[in-house]
Amino acid sequence: MHNEDVHPDVLTFAGNGEPTAHPHFAEIIDDTIALRDKYCPEAKVSVLSNSTFIYKQSVREALKKVDNNILKLDTVDPIYINKVDRPTGHYDVAEIINVMKSFEGKLIIQTMFMKGTSCGESVDNTSDTFVLPWLEAV
């Protein structure tokens, strides 16, 4: 691509799995930024994250280096999170929100508001019960 003068607009980390879960995520971001700067300096670097590992200092520092730090926060209700997002391992929504604040605005919050049912239970997080506390948090 580079030899043909074709360059990407954005280099995005996302997909099947959580990019920040990789044990060498910080080094991968550093290498990506170095290669981006060399071959396509106009391109942005983006990371789509479910926010699970932002409590790790190395992950936070790496995310602060990217152009688009996109972190997921569907709700502030832990019961809803466990029912719909079904995190495995450590996931404390209050801790996630506090760590999000440490980015001092250098983040994009991705949220999925939805209506419907799953396994016979409501997964509607569009009511004031869910939206107002979410607004307060963000």
Where are these regions (language model features)?
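Short glycine-centered, acidic/aromatic-flanked micro-motifs in structured strand/loop junctions
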Residues: F13-G15, T111
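Conserved AdoMet/S-adenosylmethionine-binding subsite of the radical SAM
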Residues: A21-V138
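Conserved alpha-helical substructure of the radical SAM core
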Residues: M1-T12, E27
